[in-house]
Regions:
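PLP-dependent amino-acid enzyme catalytic core
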Residues: 1-336
Length: 336
């Protein structure tokens, strides 16, 4: 492992946990029920890796594999689709539990709600999920992608019937463009997994959608004889996935919390810098492997209690969503 792990233990004082209800068990049950109403729904697998656990020196390792999700090879569709359902529910004065797939795609709802245009910015998976959901629910989608995005990712989104383009902008500027266009378009809605002041409701709904994955995991762990993982490793991303995972499992295991380890690449280390400052390069598996096999991380292991009794949960959030780039990285060792 060429890059060093930079780490900080979050020692911020506990608050009143005012945001935990967002990922409350009953709220996430609604998201799970909604996703189960799709004819394409099936649980993604949770795989136990006993040989890897033995190699790393921990008791158990489990990996949730999202490469099977809705045929899109990534978990992101869970968030965008549920956010759309919550938006339609709000606009029609209904509870989202009243809007399963069969109702959302009905002629009656089309007459009642009509059609909205959902705008988003994406590097690939989130936008594809929004486009897929809009297509299935009879809505419109407009997707902006930043410079450097591959044609494969653009084509995957275009196949779902969305209006999609690659802008000569970075990701953050694409988000601003999508938000501006949504504001200027009649019945335009921005569906983004990044929150900012004044835009927090839809990102919270997206997090709840991700909760479907977490709820599946809780049930699957129990079915495999694991009442509770001791450590949960999760990718930071823009924060929505990590927030969803930590929020859900903090509710599920409220009486005996696991240790949560949020991992992000050094090039986008916003959460690390925030934790190190006292404010609110490796993928999680690479970080776990380094922690358990390299002497220089002994203090880190001790700090978070990783040892031979640990039961570790990780998330593989996508498969080969861009097959050519995937082969270059995984098979050929290239960086793109």
């Amino acid at each position: 492992m060429d890059q060093k792990i930079l780490w900080a233990v979050n020692k911020m004082p506990k608050t009143d946990d005012k945001n935990l209800p967002i990922m409350g068990l009953e709220e996430i049950k609604k998201a799970r029920t909604f996703h189960k109403s799709f004819p394409q729904y099936s649980e993604t697998p949770l795989t136990k890796l006993p040989h890897m656990a033995s190699y790393l020196g921990v008791k158990e390792v489990y990996v949730k594999d999202e490469s099977y999700r809705f045929g899109l090879n990534a978990f992101k569709v869970l968030g965008g689709s549920f956010a759309m359902a919550r938006y339609i529910a709000k606009e029609t004065g209904k509870d989202v539990s009243e809007l399963p797939y069969s109702v959302l795609t009905s002629e009656q709802l089309r007459k009642e709600f009509g059609q909205a245009t959902f705008f988003t910015a994406t590097d690939g998976n989130h936008g594809r999920g929004v486009a897929w959901a809009a297509n299935r629910l009879g809505q419109k989608a407009v997707v902006h992608m930043p410079k450097g995005t591959t044609q494969t990712r653009l084509q995957n989104i275009a196949k779902e019937g969305a209006q999609v383009d690659i802008q000569e902008l970075n990701y953050d500027d694409c988000v601003r463009l999508a938000a501006k266009e949504a504001d200027e378009t009649p019945r335009g809605v921005i569906v983004q997994d990044t929150a900012w002041d004044g835009y927090e409701e839809i990102p919270a709904w997206i997090m709840q959608g991700y909760g479907t994955m977490a709820m599946e995991v809780g049930e699957q762990l129990k079915a495999q004889g694991c009442e509770r993982p001791t450590h949960i490793f999760v990718q930071a991303g823009v924060g929505s996935l990590a927030g969803a995972v930590v929020g859900y499992f903090s509710n599920l295991y409220a009486d005996n919390l696991p240790t949560f380890v949020v991992v992000e690449a050094e090039a986008a280390a916003c959460l690390y810098k925030g934790a190190a400052a006292g404010e609110s390069g490796a993928a999680p598996f690479g970080a776990l492997a380094a922690m358990m096999t390299m002497d220089e991380y002994k203090d880190l292991r001790n700090d978070i209690g990783l040892d031979e009794n640990s039961k570790v949960l990780l998330f593989s959030t996508e498969g080969d969503t861009d097959p050519d780039r995937y082969k270059n990285i995984v098979w050929k060792g290239l960086d793109k």
